[in-house]
């Protein structure tokens, strides 16, 4: 019964990671953030693989999940550095959209308490079809919301890493005892 608690905890944690990743995926789609969309998609696939491995007693699948959590933590640390503009990174670049559009984080204009005001294009027509959007009154700036999302992902991944290592070690011990009999 003691072995089940680690597995059950990992299943619950994977479910939380799926919910968190799906929520993040939705808002990244709304903001046309293509790099995070791709990362979230891969994350969802690997978490499902880890969930399957945990339920079906497949330690190799859990190992893939464990390696992915390390990569996922690295990606989320990069996102935190990007939005906090650490090390020469700038949140105003088109890096998250692969330089194919001028879209930014959905939270930039739709954060909690934000009042969005669309201004008409300039008289010179320099802005073509783009209109300037003025955003005021945000309770929390968008970059901090993105940092919070990444911090939650890091926390869930680190706890998932620990539980995955525990479940793998329990699975390996069970295999060793079965081989010795």
From Swiss-Prot:
Tissue expression profile of the protein: Detected in the brain only and specifically in neurons. Expressed in multiple regions such as cerebral cortex, thalamus, hippocampus, olfactory bulb and brainstem as well as in cerebellum with low expression in granular cell layer.
Membrane topology value: Multi-pass membrane protein
Cellular compartments annotated: Cell membrane
DNA-binding is among the record's keywords: no
Membrane-spanning residues: 2-22, 35-55, 62-82, 152-172
Sections of the chain in a coiled coil: none
Transmembrane helix in keyword set: yes
A Pfam family assignment: NKAIN
InterPro entries noted in UniProt: Na/K-Atpase_Interacting
Main location class: membrane
Keywords attached to this entry: Cell membrane, Membrane, Transmembrane, Transmembrane helix
GO cellular component: membrane; plasma membrane
Family statement: Belongs to the NKAIN family.
Oligomer and partners: Interacts with ATP1B1.
Protein's recorded name: Sodium/potassium-transporting ATPase subunit beta-1-interacting protein 3
Organism whose genome encodes this protein: Mus musculus
């Amino acid at each position: 019964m003691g072995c089940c608690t680690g597995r059950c905890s990992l299943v619950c944690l994977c479910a939380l990671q799926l919910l968190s990743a799906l929520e993040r995926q939705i808002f990244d789609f709304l903001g046309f953030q293509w790099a995070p969309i791709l990362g979230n998609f891969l994350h969802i696939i690997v978490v499902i693989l880890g969930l399957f491995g945990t339920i079906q007693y497949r330690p190799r699948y859990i190992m893939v999940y464990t390696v992915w959590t390390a990569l996922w933590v690295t990606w989320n640390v990069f996102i935190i550095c990007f939005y906090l503009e650490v090390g020469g990174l700038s949140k105003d670049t088109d890096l998250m959209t692969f330089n194919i559009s001028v879209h930014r984080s959905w939270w930039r204009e739709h954060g909690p308490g934000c009042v969005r005001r669309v201004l008409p294009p300039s008289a010179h027509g320099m802005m073509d079809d783009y209109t300037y959007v003025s955003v005021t009154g945000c309770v929390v700036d968008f970059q901090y919301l993105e940092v919070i999302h990444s911090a939650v992902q890091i926390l869930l991944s680190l706890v998932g890493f620990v539980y995955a290592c525990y479940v793998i070690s329990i699975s390996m011990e069970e295999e060793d005892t079965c081989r010795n009999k």
